[in-house]
């Protein structure tokens, strides 16, 4: 196993640095390797080997640290980053070894001069030259690999192939860096909710959720914040939700109300549960998707290259959809909270304790909360690509090249990308991590490997006790994307149940010794185990 892992890492860095070495610059007609001093070859090889070895050890130390800290989701995200780098290395190898064959592909001259991204003076001159003069002009420019017949041109030149090589490396590196910045800002936002979580240990919070305390529904803080005169009209409802995400994306009442609804639906009363830590783990679990580059995203990258034609202003127009997607997702998330508040008002005139929100997948587009994450992922990739393209143009052609004729438009595009980064990282993604907990199922981020083993062990013990002739009425146990533990008895279910307008009286105890405090994960596991034991006792009594 260790040998396979080392071989994989060695292959990864060979692919990456082999491609990086071939993509660092345009080739020249200098001496071959047989005419190069041996000391020069040895120095270059030593440099590449040392750098690759240091990076490999750095990633390995990071992986070991994540494993010791039980950051399994981030560890999987790191493995996905390695996989993306390996894909990049394979693309690099294909470009390198396929270079002689790609350069031999010729296309008609008319096709070669169509859909150009940059119409330079040389291109205008080429369009006026005769085919024979065009070939002589290209040969004089140093492109000696052209062997096309009269009236044809190479599909892509050697210099263009190396510039494309550099673009692919820029894309992979900037996407990873962009994703890391997004994750850091999101975690910073969620860290600010820790003070709200600590409030749940106070006596004031216990009083606020006391079911013996009657209040009018419209007087509760959550309902007041999300219902007003503008919520009665659909148009103003969404306009209000749109602007709300910029000023008060998540308030204290939002966090405490959604936390109360989540615990009432998925956990037993009286259990200690760190909801803020659970959201942080859930965000880390979603990061595995955000950091990857799917075939759909690669296809969007190719489509952009296809339509990046001179005069179409593709660079500017392509920077608008990511921002619109992020704004639409943020508006939808705010609308979900407002809808839950409206349903409380329509259903109950009086509530006991804290309002109990009823979460469901029906609040989300196509009953799929995961769709919002895919939209965020697409917007982040497109935004990262816009920034990548800007720096690639600057590196390869210069800041004031023909790609940046309208420099004011370029600056506007960069501000849009920066605004989308801040909006998505600090507002939309944390809001998504909170609101999607109101779906129909609990995410697996609440469980770690130790808990999964404990649950499976209990499952196995119960099956052994029952024997082949006896079987529980209904048991579904395991760790998956949505954890479910159901029974024929309505009293022993982890699924969301209908409310009558009052909430459970959840009591929290402060522990004097922090070391003896049961973690939220252990509490969730013990809760599931208790329910299994109850099922077993009910079965024996019957």
From Swiss-Prot:
Residues 60-82, 187-288, 337-374, 436-542 are cytoplasmic. GO terms for molecular function: calmodulin binding. Residues 449-470 are annotated as: Calmodulin-binding. Residues 1-38, 104-165, 310-315, 396-414 are extracellular. It comes from the Eukaryota. Its main location: membrane. Keywords: Calmodulin-binding, Cell membrane, Membrane, Pathogenesis-related protein, Plant defense, Transmembrane, Transmembrane helix. InterPro entries: Mlo. It is found in: Cell membrane; Endomembrane system. GO terms for cellular component: cytoplasm; endomembrane system; plasma membrane. GO terms for biological process: defense response; pollen tube reception. It is a multi-pass membrane protein. Disruption phenotype: Impaired pollen tube reception in the female gametophyte synergids; the pollen tube fails to arrest and continues to grow inside the female gametophyte. Restricted to pollen, synergids, pistils and immature anthers. Also detected in seedlings, leaves, stems and inflorescens. The C-terminus contains a calmodulin-binding domain, which binds calmodulin in a calcium-dependent fashion. Belongs to the MLO family. May be involved in modulation of pathogen defense and leaf cell death. Activity seems to be regulated by Ca(2+)-dependent calmodulin binding and seems not to require heterotrimeric G proteins. Controls pollen tube reception in the female gametophyte synergids. This is MLO-like protein 7. It comes from Arabidopsis thaliana.
């Amino acid at each position: 196993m260790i040998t396979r892992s080392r071989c994989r890492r060695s292959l990864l860095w060979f692919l990456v640095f082999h491609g990086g070495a071939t993509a660092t610059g345009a080739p020249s007609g200098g001496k071959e390797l047989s005419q190069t001093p041996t000391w020069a070859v040895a120095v270059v090889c030593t440099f590449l080997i040392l750098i690759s070895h240091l990076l490999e050890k750095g990633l390995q130390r990071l992986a070991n640290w994540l494993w010791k800290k039980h950051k399994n989701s981030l560890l999987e995200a790191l493995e996905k980053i390695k996989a993306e780098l390996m894909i990049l290395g394979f693309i690099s190898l294909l470009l390198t070894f396929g270079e002689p064959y790609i350069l031999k592909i010729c296309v008609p001259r008319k096709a070669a001069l169509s859909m150009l991204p940059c119409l330079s003076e040389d291109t205008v001159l080429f369009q006026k030259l005769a085919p024979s003069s065009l070939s002589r002009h290209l040969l004089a420019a140093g492109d000696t690999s052209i062997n096309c017949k009269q009236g044809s041109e190479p599909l892509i030149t050697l210099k263009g192939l190396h510039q494309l090589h550099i673009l692919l490396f820029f894309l992979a590196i900037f996407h990873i860096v962009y994703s890391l910045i997004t994750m850091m800002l999101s975690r910073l936002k969620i860290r600010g909710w820790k003070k709200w979580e600590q409030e749940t240990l106070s006596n004031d919070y216990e009083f606020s959720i006391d079911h013996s305390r009657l209040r009018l529904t419209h007087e509760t803080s959550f309902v007041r914040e999300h219902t007003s005169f503008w919520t009665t009209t659909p148009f103003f409802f969404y306009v209000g939700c749109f602007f709300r995400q910029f000023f008060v994306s998540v308030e204290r009442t939002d966090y405490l109300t959604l936390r109360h609804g989540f615990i009432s639906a998925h956990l037993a009363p009286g259990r200690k549960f760190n909801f803020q830590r659970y959201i942080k783990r859930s965000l880390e679990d979603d990061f595995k998707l955000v950091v990857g580059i799917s075939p759909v995203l690669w296809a969007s990258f190719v489509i952009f290259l296809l339509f990046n034609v001179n005069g179409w202003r593709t660079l500017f127009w392509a920077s608008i959809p990511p921002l619109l997607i992020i704004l639409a997702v943020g508006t939808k998330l705010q609308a979900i909270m407002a809808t839950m508040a409206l349903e409380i008002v329509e259903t109950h005139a009086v509530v006991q304790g804290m309002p109990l929100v009823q979460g469901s997948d029906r609040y989300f587009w196509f009953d799929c909360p995961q769709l919002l994450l895919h939209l965020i992922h697409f917007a982040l990739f497109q935004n990262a690509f816009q920034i990548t393209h800007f720096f690639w143009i600057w590196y390869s052609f210069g800041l004031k090249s023909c790609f940046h004729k309208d420099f004011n438009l370029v600056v506007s595009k960069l501000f849009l990308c920066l605004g989308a980064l801040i909006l998505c990282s600090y507002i939309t993604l944390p809001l998504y991590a909170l609101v999607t907990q109101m779906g129909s199922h609990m995410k697996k981020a609440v469980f770690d490997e130790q808990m999964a083993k404990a649950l499976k062990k209990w499952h196995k013990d119960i099956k052994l006790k029952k024997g082949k002739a006896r079987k529980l009425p209904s048991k579904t146990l395991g760790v998956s994307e949505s954890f479910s533990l159901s029974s024929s008895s309505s009293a022993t279910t982890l699924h969301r149940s209908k409310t009558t307008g009052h909430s459970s009286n959840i009591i929290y105890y402060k522990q004097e010794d922090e070391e003896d405090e049961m973690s939220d994960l252990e509490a969730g596991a013990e809760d599931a185990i208790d329910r299994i034991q109850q099922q077993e006792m009910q079965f024996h009594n019957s």
